[in-house]
Amino acid sequence: MIASILERFDPDFLARAGIGFGGGTRIALEIDEYRESSDIDFLCPTTASYRAVREAVNNQGLGRILRCPLAFAREVRADRYGVRTAVEHGGHVIKLEFLSFEDWNLNIVDHPLFPVPVLDQSACFTTKLTAANDRGLAAPYKDVFDLLAMRAYWGDPPAQAVAEAERHYGRSVVPKADQAIAHFLALPATDKRKAAAALGIEPDFLERLEETPVRAGPSPGP
């Protein structure tokens, strides 16, 4: 469903503007769709990229950002932080956002799994480390699950990902993400299963994540 919505966006517009598909949905889709996610987030890491979005949209639609029409569930709303709306597709309502990440070094690439430009894995680590600082202790622990899945499938976050997260959130960004992960892993088994079920995560996948190293940041050296 998400892929069919993404196909309606103009990839050339997004590439020219330097806009990338990111967030938890982008991560989950690459990691075998390990959890359910019905949000579509595009990140705009420069003033110019967000300006391109603001110039293209109005309260009725997304203009030239789309190459095929979408059915909107609510009007398009814009402020200095983002452009937000929701679309109806396949009987579902999907939240859609273009978020201003001005002055963030987030690498945007083409990826064979996606019909639009996406954040690379390093940029995904950066944004998830900071997201875990903002809301990591909040059930159903989406950011914790994503960090654990990324560690299990992608390995340690690159040094540049940690450096960029620290540039915006300070040197406590990794310790605070570690605390969120440790908090989740210390929950009673029933609470962890409940959180996983709320996100459509299979029990065997949860068991694999529980075996992942607790640290959100790079593993300690020898």
Functional labels for PLM-detected ranges:
Residues 1-222:
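Compositionally biased terminal segments of proteins
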